[in-house]
Structures are given as structure tokens and as C-alpha cells.
């Protein structure tokens, strides 16, 4: 079994690589490889797409690696490889992003990425730090994760899904903030599982052993 963390120069993958390698060892889930090569994505059994920064910049960066975006599309939509998007990697699952400019996403989960607008003016944007999760819909990747568990967020925009059934969990930050999305063989987290201690490691382990 091979899990590929896609490296397209949009964030430091060191902590994510360590967390995935640790949980792959603990669960017997095989090898974890960080790669920017389309051929590695093509042979992967599972794909993880991280991303830090602004949606348009990450989308352009991914597109600048010849064949990489296409390899992800092929693996996820045509060959149904399990996929996990993290932070901007999750946002790119949307129809479009509205950060700075309108930018098309993969369009795998209907909805758009919009700026967080807390109802409480004392709540600062970006949403940064620990927050509680509220589980909206059960999912194998959420096994052992309950409402009230903590996750670590750093973001100014969030994914407004078109269909409630595809929002698996949310957080409260003066408004409902989408925390986890999912459909078919794909899931995404707005928070960073590799920085979310027990909750994040549980989610990573669940993803690595998920058999959709």
C-alpha cells in the first residue's frame, strides 16, 4: 500500500509526513511518500493533498507542475482512489474559491470558498488556534472522533457546501465553519490533522485504513 502526499511547494510538509508515517506504521498501512511526480500519484493507493496560503496561489502552483493536477483528477474521479485534502487542499475540492479573485476548484463537492464572517466583531480573522468540532454526519474517517473533540485551525476562508450531507463536521467561530467534508472516496479537513494531536492522529489512522 502506498500513500502519496502531494508536494507542489505550497507549505512545509515535514510535520504532515511525520504524522502520516507514524500512523502508517501503527496501522500497518504501508509506505508514505512525499512526491511531486504525476507517475507516483498514478500508482498511489491513497492520495493526500495539503496546502497552505491563498486559494488562487495554491491552485496555480499545483497547475504549474506538469500533469500533476491531471494525475490527481484521474486517480480520484476515475479510479476512485481514497483522497484527503488538508486546509487549502480541502478547499480546492470546491466548485470555486473567492479569495482575492474567482478561481475554479476541482468541483468534486459543490460549493464555494468564502471569507469567514463571524457575527461577533471581537472574533478576529484569520481563525487561528484550537476549536471544538461538532460532528454533523457519521463517516468511517470520523470513527472515534466525537463532538467536542479539538482540532487546530489556521484560515481566513472556509468551504460553504451546497449540500448539507457533504458537510461531515463543523466548528463554531461566530458562525458555522465547515471543518470536514466528504463524498464517495474523498474527504477533506479545513483544520490541520498533523497539528491536532489525538484527534488529528485518529483521523489520519482512519483515513489510512478506510476501505470505501
UniProtKB/Swiss-Prot annotation:
Keywords: Amino-acid biosynthesis, Cytoplasm, Glutamine amidotransferase, Histidine biosynthesis, Hydrolase, Lyase. Its EC number is 4.3.2.10, 3.5.1.2. IGPS catalyzes the conversion of PRFAR and glutamine to IGP, AICAR and glutamate. The HisH subunit catalyzes the hydrolysis of glutamine to glutamate and ammonia as part of the synthesis of IGP and AICAR. The resulting ammonia molecule is channeled to the active site of HisF. The lineage of its organism: Bacteria, Pseudomonadati, Pseudomonadota, Alphaproteobacteria, Rhodobacterales. One of its GO terms (cellular component) is cytoplasm. The active site is at residues 87, 192, 194. Residues 2-212 form the Glutamine amidotransferase type-1 domain. The gene is hisH. This is Imidazole glycerol phosphate synthase subunit HisH. One of its GO terms (molecular function) is glutaminase activity. It is found in: Cytoplasm. Pathway: Amino-acid biosynthesis; L-histidine biosynthesis; L-histidine from 5-phospho-alpha-D-ribose 1-diphosphate: step 5/9. It comes from Cereibacter sphaeroides (strain ATCC 17023 / DSM 158 / JCM 6121 / CCUG 31486 / LMG 2827 / NBRC 12203 / NCIMB 8253 / ATH 2.4.1.). Its main location: cytoplasm. Heterodimer of HisH and HisF. It holds the Pfam family GATase.
